[in-house]
């Protein structure tokens, strides 16, 4: 790997080039670590929904007359398998919706979307994980129940009415019933696929083997094909002539009589109705498509729209190599619109055609300047490969570089919680290292605005924690420009900047502008003191937005302070952006 200069940034400029077609795929997760009332409300709500669906389905199969003979063979395992199947179908459908990024961005941006809804949308990854968890729990119950069903089909063979049987004779090996039927084989494949997806989704494994996680996760179309075909074999039978053969009639049909309503304490054989024919059975119709059809269509429409928007490479206007292994890329894309706090998915075709990585916009396009920028922290195989490709251009002339630089494709933009910075009178932005990127877009927005008069935001606190002093140079010029702009407009109190250095070595602060130099403190910030100070200064502000982008430890600490420092008069609203 080539070395990155530690002093002055190195800039490479490229002229616009001809766009060409290129398909794309995406993968990203926006991670929310801390439990707040949004998490709890959704978890309680979704638990109630799943319990209700399970209970209603369980009772239906327990008491419905057309399942009497099937229920007589399988017992309670029939009800458990069908109840868990409904929960499984429900979550297989719901798990799609948090991944419809374009739809959620449009919905989040409407004026009708209240804060509670926006905060829920920002927790799309949490909702996705909750649905996956219920899906796995339902799968376990469903598998165990169907193993019991296979055993009961073998031991409780119905010799009177052979149509209702799955086994061909009494005592047939249950394993054979599972391994030689469409339902059994497709079920085994689905379980294996879900286990692989779940194991590779563990944060530790995903972090170190992201490509493997991505490949396996994108096998989900196979899962849904198996899910839709799972019941096509028609193993479970339901009675289709309940009107002419009422379960519980006195006709010798070889079964225990039961009235239509299925109450065991109300069975009276001597008063039961006589039947005029034997029971007839048809395969039980699948209900899976009723659950998943609409969510799949919504997801496909969202996916097609995103692919259409990201099929052309963007124009690379410039590349800047910053200290501390950070690369700044400036792009231009036709009709690209974004707002501060949003992020994009980036793909470099010379590195991988399938890997898309999330990066927060550090400067959004405007009417005067249609370009936008991102800052990439070189950490990992993909970012290292991108850096190597860009470094190669430093040894070529501009004409050659313009035609040989790697092509980049952009998907998005997508929403993040930092979009709400301007929706509060007072906002506190807390960043750890490269977590400054979403707030850089906010600062750039303030810098580029002609006037701040129409903004709701009146006070912005920026707390930036870094280990190296070089990190502050990423946005030192921009922060200084904003400060002088506010000073000229006679509103310097709008921006309050506090920088903290946590490294062990003695820092060299001489490279920083005087404005930032006066605001640097050594050591970790006393967050509780800062929160108390903000609450004391903002007595006229009831709601204060707190936005965090950094390590899990930092986010947890800030979340706890938002709860402990909130009073009846002043409430701190916690928001987190973190990309896994």
Model regions: which residues?
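Juxtamembrane membrane-interface segments at transmembrane-helix boundaries in membrane proteins
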Residues: 23-38, 66-87, 116-127, 157-188, ...
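Extended, low-complexity, polar regulatory segments
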Residues: 1-33, 116, 371, 500
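Classical protein tyrosine phosphatase
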Residues: 93, 125-149, 432-463, 568
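Reductase modules of NAD(P)H-dependent flavoproteins
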Residues: 242-275, 368, 374, 379-383, ...
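Membrane-interfacial segments at transmembrane helix termini in multi-pass membrane proteins
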Residues: 285-321, 329
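Membrane-embedded alpha-helices of multi-pass membrane proteins, especially ion channels
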Residues: 46-75, 89-110, 134-156, 167-173, ...
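Ferredoxin-reductase
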Residues: 314-405, 467
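Membrane-interface recognition of transmembrane alpha-helix starts
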Residues: 22-64, 77-94, 126-143, 178-191, ...
């Amino acid at each position: 790997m080539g070395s990155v200069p530690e002093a002055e940034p190195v800039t490479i400029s490229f002229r616009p080039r001809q766009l060409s077609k290129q398909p794309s795929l995406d993968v990203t997760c926006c991670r929310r670590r801390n439990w707040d009332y949004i998490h709890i409300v959704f978890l309680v709500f979704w638990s109630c929904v799943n319990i209700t669906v399970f209970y209603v389905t369980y009772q239906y199969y327990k008491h419905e007359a057309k399942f009497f003979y099937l229920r007589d063979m399988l017992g309670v395992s029939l009800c458990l398998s069908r109840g868990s199947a409904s929960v499984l179908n429900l979550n297989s459908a719901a798990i799609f919706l948090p991944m419809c990024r374009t739809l959620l961005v449009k919905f989040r941006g409407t004026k009708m979307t209240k804060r509670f809804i926006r905060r829920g949308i920002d927790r799309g990854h949490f909702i996705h994980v909750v649905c996956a968890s219920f899906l796995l729990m339902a799968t376990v119950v469903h598998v165990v129940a169907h193993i019991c069903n296979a055993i009961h089909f073998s031991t409780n063979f119905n010799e009177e009415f052979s149509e209702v049987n799955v086994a061909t004779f009494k005592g047939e090996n249950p394993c054979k019933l599972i391994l030689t039927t469409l339902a059994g084989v497709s079920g085994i494949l689905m379980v294996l696929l879900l286990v692989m997806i779940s194991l590779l989704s563990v944060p530790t494994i995903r972090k170190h083997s992201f490509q493997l996680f991505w490949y396996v996760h994108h096998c989900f179309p196979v899962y849904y094909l198996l899910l839709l075909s799972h019941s096509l074999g028609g193993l479970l039978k339901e009675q289709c002539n309940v009107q002419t053969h009422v379960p519980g009639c006195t006709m010798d049909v070889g079964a225990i009589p039961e009235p239509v309503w299925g109450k065991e304490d109300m069975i009276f054989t001597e008063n039961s109705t006589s039947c005029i024919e034997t029971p007839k059975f048809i395969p039980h119709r699948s209900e899976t498509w009723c659950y998943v059809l609409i969510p799949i269509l919504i997801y496909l429409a969202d996916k097609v729209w995103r692919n259409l928007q990201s099929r052309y490479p963007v124009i690379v206007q410039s590349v800047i190599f910053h200290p501390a292994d950070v690369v700044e890329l400036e792009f231009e894309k036709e009709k690209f619109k974004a707002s501060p706090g949003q992020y994009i998915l980036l793909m470099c075709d010379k590195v991988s055609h399938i890997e898309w990585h999330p990066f927060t916009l550090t400067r959004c396009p405007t009417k005067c300047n249609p370009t936008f920028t991102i800052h990439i922290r070189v950490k990992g195989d993909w970012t290292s490969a991108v850096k190597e490709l860009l470094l190669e251009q430093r040894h070529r002339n501009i004409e050659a570089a313009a035609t040989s630089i790697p092509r980049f494709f952009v998907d998005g933009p997508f929403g993040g919680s930092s979009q709400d910075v301007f929706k509060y009178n007072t906002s506190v932005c807390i960043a750890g290292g490269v977590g400054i990127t979403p707030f850089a877009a906010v600062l750039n927005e303030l810098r580029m605005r002609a006037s701040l008069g129409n903004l709701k935001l009146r006070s912005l606190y920026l707390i930036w924690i870094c280990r190296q002093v070089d990190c502050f140079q990423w946005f030192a010029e921009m922060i200084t420009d904003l400060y002088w702009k506010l000073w000229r407009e006679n509103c310097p109190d709008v921006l309050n900047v506090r920088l903290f250095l946590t490294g062990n070595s003695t820092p060299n602060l001489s490279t920083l502008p005087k404005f930032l130099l006066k605001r640097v403190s050594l050591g970790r910030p006393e967050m509780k003191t800062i929160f108390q100070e903000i609450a004391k200064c903002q007595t006229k502000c009831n709601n204060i937005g707190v936005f965090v982008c950094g390590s899990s430890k930092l986010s947890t600490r800030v979340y706890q302070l938002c709860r402990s420092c909130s009073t009846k008069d002043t409430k701190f609203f916690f928001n987190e952006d973190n990309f896994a």
